[in-house]
Amino acid sequence: MAEEHRLQEPRLCANNCGFFGSTATQNLCSKCFRDLQHQEQNSSTAKHALTQSLAAVGAAASSSVSPPPPPPADSKEIVEAKSEKRAAAEPEEADGPPQDPKRCLTCRRRVGITGFRCRCGFVFCGTHRYAEQHECSFDFKRMGKDKIAKANPIVKADKLEKI
């Protein structure tokens, strides 16, 4: 019974950090064990990257005329998405002259913090805050249709079971 008690008594961390370790974590405390795993993971990824770069250099040396490999499909999609966002943002920036956000766009009255920001992106006073008053270019009908379409997806007949 004394031997069983000795097996279960806590052991100090193998790194002598002052905390207790367990046999499941190689006699390390949880923090030291986590650090050890992190170091092993970093070294394995570094070795993997090194072998890939050496293989790429060897392949490039053997065929100096070969074209560069195409980028992965995911990066193409990301580049296309970024270019679409930039294209969509450019016309908005080019539409109006640089404006002072503290003045109404229509009457140029100072509004300060009491100004109303419209969905078209401009600031208006209390008189011109409504879309009809400042000839808003924002398409509220399209926004409403998009919200309804998003909230109520189309139910396809082939997914429903017939009674």
UniProtKB/Swiss-Prot annotation:
InterPro entries: AN1-like_Znf (IPR035896), AN1_A20_ZnFinger (IPR050652), Znf_A20 (IPR002653), Znf_AN1 (IPR000058)
Renumbered zinc finger spans (AN1-type): 98-144
Domain of life: Eukaryota
Keywords, alphabetical: Metal-binding, Zinc, Zinc-finger
Presence of keyword Zinc: yes
Gene3D superfamilies: 1.20.5.4770, AN1-like Zinc finger
A GO BP entry: response to heat
Stated name of the protein: Zinc finger A20 and AN1 domain-containing stress-associated protein 3
Species of the source: Arabidopsis thaliana (Mouse-ear cress)
Gene symbol of the encoding locus: SAP3
